[in-house]
């Protein structure tokens, strides 16, 4: 899940990190999950529930965008999904169920596709004292982008643990190459070379059938261990492999 902050003249969008919460948390805007799986068999669409536990009234703007769209971009490239309702009143203690539906059936059938479910909660009123010296008012909006994976019916069902086991690691010079031979997107959790945690950065999510390269400063490691994030947003059991 991506959470960001962007600033425009007279209107400030602040990070939702403090108020967007995972399932089970007691306060904030609670999300049904931290990622969304859209199975190809869902011909009538899927639902996703968002709960307002902030005590404040919001307008919730919801849409699906290409994954990696620039935060705050007013008109990102179209994605083949609609969300209903696209804009809704979001009162305290409301549990709003969104309906997400595929509108074009031209996505690849031999691998997953990834998009972003963009959720922007805009307060119905500015907070007291939010007016700046110039007279502009600050509007504090919470925005989250969750990964939405389209999973074609043609794919063989593979558990998250099996996807983790399928990953292939090898050393080439000072780089660790990680290959994903599956038709699924795989998000790495924690990777360790010997006992040292590897800094992954943008290489954390592997596209289907792709390879990423991670720089490994220091001595050549003898082994690697890893886990991945499953469909529920939780880490799988750790796997390990010799690099000899």
Question: Where in the sequence are the language-model features?
Answer:
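Bacterial N-terminal signal peptides
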Residues: 6-15
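Terminal connector regions
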Residues: 103-155, 221-244
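Intrinsically disordered, low-complexity segments enriched in serine, threonine, and glycine
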Residues: 165-244
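Buried hydrophobic-core signal for structured, non-transmembrane domains
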Residues: 46-52, 100, 115-120, 175-180
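Positively charged n-region of N-terminal signal peptides that target proteins for export
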Residues: 1-4
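Intrinsically disordered, low-complexity Pro/Gly/Ser/Thr-rich segments with frequent PxxP/GP/PP motifs
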Residues: 73-106, 196-223
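Beta-sheet-dominated interaction scaffolds and their linkers
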Residues: 21-53, 157-171, 203
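Short acidic, flexible loop segments centered on an aromatic residue
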Residues: 53-75, 181-198
């Amino acid at each position: 899940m991506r959470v960001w902050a962007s600033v425009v003249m007279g209107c400030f969008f602040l990070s939702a990190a403090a108020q967007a919460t995972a399932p089970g948390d007691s306060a904030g805007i609670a999300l049904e999950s931290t990622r969304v799986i859209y199975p190809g068999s869902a011909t009538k669409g899927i639902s996703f529930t968002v709960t307002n536990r902030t005590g404040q009234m919001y307008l919730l703007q919801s849409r699906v965008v290409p994954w990696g769209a620039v935060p705050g971009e007013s008109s990102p490239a179209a994605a083949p999904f609609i969300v209903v309702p696209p804009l809704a009143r979001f009162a305290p203690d409301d549990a709003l169920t969104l309906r997400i539906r595929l509108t074009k059936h031209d996505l690849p059938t031999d691998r997953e596709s990834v998009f972003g479910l963009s959720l922007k909660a805009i307060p119905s009123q500015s907070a007291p004292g939010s007016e700046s010296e110039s007279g502009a008012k600050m509007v504090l909006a919470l925005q989250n982008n969750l990964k939405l994976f389209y999973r074609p019916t043609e794919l063989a069902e593979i558990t998250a643990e099996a996807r983790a086991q399928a990953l292939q690691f090898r050393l080439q010079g000072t780089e660790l190459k990680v290959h994903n031979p599956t038709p699924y997107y795989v998000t790495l959790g924690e990777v360790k070379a010997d006992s040292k945690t590897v800094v992954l950065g943008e290489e954390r999510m592997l596209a289907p059938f792709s390879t990423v390269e991670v720089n490994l400063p220091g001595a050549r490691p003898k082994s690697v261990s890893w886990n991945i994030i499953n469909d529920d947003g939780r880490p799988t059991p750790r796997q390990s492999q010799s690099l000899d």
